[in-house]
Amino acid sequence: MTTQQPVAVLGGGSFGTAIANLLAENGHQVRQWMRDPEQAEAIRVNRENPRYLKGIKVRPEVEPVTDLTAALEVSELIFVALPSSALRSVLSPHIERLSGKMLVSLTKGIEAQSFKLMSQILEEIVPQARIGVLSGPNLAREIAEHALTATVVASEDEDLCQQVQAALHGRTFRVYASNDRFGVELGGALKNVYAIIAGMAVALDMGENTKSMLITRALAEMTRFAVSQGANPMTFLGLAGVGDLIVTCSSPKSRNYQVGFALGQGLSLEEAVTRLGEVAEGVNTLKVLKVKAQEVQVYMPLVAGLHAILFEGRTLSQVIEALMRAEPKTDVDFISITGFN
């Protein structure tokens, strides 16, 4: 891949647009595909994505397109920023065009029916593609505004990682590499659940000690579950684990945090989602994660507690009381306590 060869970004949302701008700043011609012709025309004419990144200028090297076939045919590196629900329907008709190309997922989610992550779905759709994921503490608007940011590209394909680093790395955006694709991607999906809990804690003015406890125990739960599924626990000490968890659990810009904050103010889940205007990923992830944790017998008390509040009619005070009465475990799962006297 050279800077003369176009790069494709699939999806017209905030993160896809932020990544498209970064690529353009680094000298790439970018084909940003979106379904909506009106959105594409608005970006083409006004150089702005008013629906998702209002006030951010889209660079002239970014060409918004609605012809997916044309965008895929000219690109070897393709960033996939599609909603999880649209992944199969959009890409399945283009298997031959995608074969052998580099597909990098930007979407943080879990498919409910299969408990598959987005890169696993890409692998299923296009077995001959080269697959990677990009994840980390990456709020789209801050990237677009050139706040200093770091991310992780993860793949078993070292050359893919190097090409993504070369394409995106810039003066305000640093790209690290990992070979733990599953762990990096799982961290990005799981942290959305805990952002809901964090938002509730802030709305209820629970204090800094409480927020710190919640984030730390959330990291323990995420890591415990991920290891049960084959991920490397060390991944969760990096940007895609604790880094993403901190920004999502502490930023009012996070949709999942906003839902939790509304719940903490006394709104129902339906009212909270209505206020947000869209479903927060953490709500759907919570449902499938609760079932999966029970299935594989992984201890996840925060997940169970939030599920009880949102879907089982329990109150927050009841759940907190149960959590605080539970038998204390060891602080860090992966440190032996056999040396205790």
From Swiss-Prot:
Binding site for NADPH: 14-15, 35, 108, 140, 255, 279, 281
Keyword set, alphabetical order: Cytoplasm, Lipid biosynthesis, Lipid metabolism, NAD, NADP, Nucleotide-binding, Oxidoreductase, Phospholipid biosynthesis, Phospholipid metabolism
Subcellular compartments: Cytoplasm
Catalytic-site annotation from UniProt: 191
Uppermost EC category: oxidoreductase
Protein residues bound to sn-glycerol 3-phosphate: 108, 136, 191, 244, 254-256
InterPro entries: 6-PGluconate_DH-like_C_sf, 6PGD_dom2, G3P_DH_NAD-dep, G3P_DH_NAD-dep_C, G3P_DH_NAD-dep_N, NAD(P)-bd_dom_sf
Keyword Oxidoreductase among record annotations: yes
Xref: PROSITE patterns: NAD_G3PDH
GO biological process: carbohydrate metabolic process; glycerol-3-phosphate biosynthetic process; glycerol-3-phosphate catabolic process; glycerophospholipid biosynthetic process
Signal peptide: none
Pfam families in the record: NAD_Gly3P_dh_C, NAD_Gly3P_dh_N
Pathway: Membrane lipid metabolism; glycerophospholipid metabolism
Protein's job: Catalyzes the reduction of the glycolytic intermediate dihydroxyacetone phosphate (DHAP) to sn-glycerol 3-phosphate (G3P), the key precursor for phospholipid synthesis.
PANTHER family in UniProt: GLYCEROL-3-PHOSPHATE DEHYDROGENASE, GLYCEROL-3-PHOSPHATE DEHYDROGENASE [NAD(+)] 2, CHLOROPLASTIC
Protein name: Glycerol-3-phosphate dehydrogenase [NAD(P)+]
Species of provenance: Pseudomonas syringae pv. tomato (strain ATCC BAA-871 / DC3000)
Gene assigned in the entry: gpsA
